[in-house]
Amino acid sequence: MSRAAFIAGDWGTSRLRLYLCDAGGHVLARGEGEGASAPDCAGRFAAAVAAWDKAHGALPAVLGGMVGSTIGWREVPYLKCPAKPAAIAGAALRFEVEGRAIAILPGLSCTNISGVPDVMRGEETQILGALRLMPKLAKGKHLLCLPGTHVKWAWIEDSTITKFQTALSGELFNILAHHSVLARDSGAVDPESKAYRLGLDLARDRYEDGLLHLLFSARSRVVTGEMAKDAAASYLSGLIIGIDVYAAVAASLSLFSAGVVHLVCTPMLAALYSKAITAYGLGAAVIDGDDAALAGLVHAHAEIFS
């Protein structure tokens, strides 16, 4: 059996995912814990890895995500783009706790394509992992999409994160679906449904009307009998994601090549965004978000502790 060499931790606001890894980055064991927003990160981390410590000693740990924010363990300043993988690893905050070497990765900041400040924390680790898992991203210009509550669109050139832009798509959908008249109690989103496709098509064909002028159709189509109530959530999702994709792609065609958008996310979000991307005539390549986060942490460990 391989010998344990380090601990990798993907530590978001609501959940901690831990990986006990050998020197080559292969996972030997997994663990979980509370998110970075809960109090006493140091104590909770120690408790989560206590069994590993007993078996292997106090192994070094590399952590990414909201653990480095103002609500986390220790705040790590944002690194300004353009940012290369080595620079991200080099900007990690390093310290020791009870004989354990710890490194927390920074988030990134930039002036986005709208000319305003933007930030990310956690997604940069997934981007590092995407570069490791898909070597062809190391050369040329590429567009990565990292869907979630706050969707990140990142532009990569020769392994360098040049800039990125945040879309509030996930949070907007959750607010409208659960706290408005548009799609309350309307069922789950189905990326294969006619309603989802209808939302995508309207977003594509009437983009110039603006999202605010299209959203109420999720309600009016139901009230007039044109669409079943249980289809409203899928339709609303199609509208929001469709406009999100169109805005990001249309604003940046000169910033990426090959006509492919690389998605880094869960399978469900990949299904939703892939359909939207292909609706605009582009290809979609998918990288699992958890796999990318782990690969990014493994890469960072090699850079920091080598």
Which residue ranges define each predicted feature?
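Short glycine-aspartate micro-motif
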Residues: F6-D10, P60-G64, H142-L146, H262
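Glycine-rich phosphate-binding loops at beta-strand->alpha-helix junctions
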Residues: R15, A258-A276
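N-terminal phosphate-binding loop and adjacent alpha-helix
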Residues: V27-L59, G68-E75, R184-D185
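Short glycine-rich, Thr/Ser-proximal phosphate-binding strand/loop in the N-terminal lobe
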Residues: A5-G43, I287
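Glycine-rich phosphate-binding loop plus the immediately following alpha-helix
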Residues: S109-R204
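Short beta-strand-loop/turn "lid" adjacent to the catalytic site in phosphate-handling enzymes
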Residues: W52-P117, D158
